[in-house]
Structures are given as structure tokens and as C-alpha cells.
Amino acid sequence: MYIENHLLKDTFAGRSAKQLHCNKKSGLLEYPDMIVLHYTAGGNAMSSAHYLARADTDASAHLVIARDGGIIQLLPFDTIAWHAGQSEYAGRTNLNRYSIGIEMDNAGELHRREGKFYSWFNREYMPDEVYTDCINGRARYWHLYTKEQIMTVYAVCRLLLKADPIHYIVGHSEITNRKLDPGAAFPLKQFREQLLKINNP
């Protein structure tokens, strides 16, 4: 897999990136130095990608990563996407102007009812799909990411780090207090430390 003309080309783990047209453009993303990781909080990758591509949806992203590791690209990497919203990090605001947005197909925070786990859209998840986090003595439940997803996101981020001077890899929750993604089930700290060694050995 490689980047050509700001689009992913060829295959990774036997899968090629699908291109889904998204006409929501806010200008040129000239010097991205940040990657923002999100979860879709949706039912599946393709439905989330189509939702983000819709003209009447006030959001978009560069990529959606499916649970099997498949990639859907909505926008070229040199185009501003609407993924960060009202945001602030490292002294800057409006981070869509500086960042590449990657959405991962994941239901997000789950809720436990009568020993079972459900998403906000009322889909049940089996216990082996659930990550349990405990904050201040209170258990919180999250939809697990798949190994294939994490491997694909890592590979894409490596390509982006080679193509652009990326200095920051952050979760959406780190740039705004309105969001929780990518949530406690994503190993963000280790992921970030390993990747940023590429540009800062």
C-alpha cells in the first residue's frame, strides 16, 4: 500500500482501499501535522461512510476503517475534512485545518442491562466483544476494536508519517471535551508512542 496523489493505492493484507465520493470540501489541507482517531458509533463501516459522505451530514472524514481491516477513503489527504469540530490542542483551535481524520467502525461506549451489553442503537454485543474500564470505582463498557483494524490503522498512519511532518496523533476526546472517542478500548498511548518514533527516533 502506498499514497499517490493523496489517495491510498494498492492493497494491504489482501484488501484494496475503496474510494467513496464525498463532495464536502472546505479547501486545501496543505501541511497536516496531526492525525485524529475516531470511532464511528455506527452499525457498520459502509453505512457510516455513506452517512459521512451525505451532503446533508455536517461531518466527514478522510478514511473509515472496517472491522475486517478494509479501508474506505472519502477524501484525498490534501483536502480539509469536517471531523474535529470545535477543537483545541497544543495552542491551536479549529483543528480540521491541520489534521487527517480516521474513523474506525466501532460502536463506542456500551451499556449493560440485565447482564447483556448494548450499543446506543440497541445492538447486543457478546462479552468477548466488550472491553471493561473502571474509573473512580465505576465500570464502563466499550466495544472492542479488532486486531485487523488496529493493524490497518497503524499501517496507514505509518504511510502518513512518511508523507507529512506528523507531530501529533490524538484521540477525538483529547481535542474536545464533547467526545469520548476512540474510547478506552483503543490502545492510544502505546500506538502513539510507537508511531511517533518514526519521525522522532
Language model segments and positions:
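Low-complexity, intrinsically disordered regions enriched in charged/polar residues
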Residues: 2, 115, 169, 182-185, ...
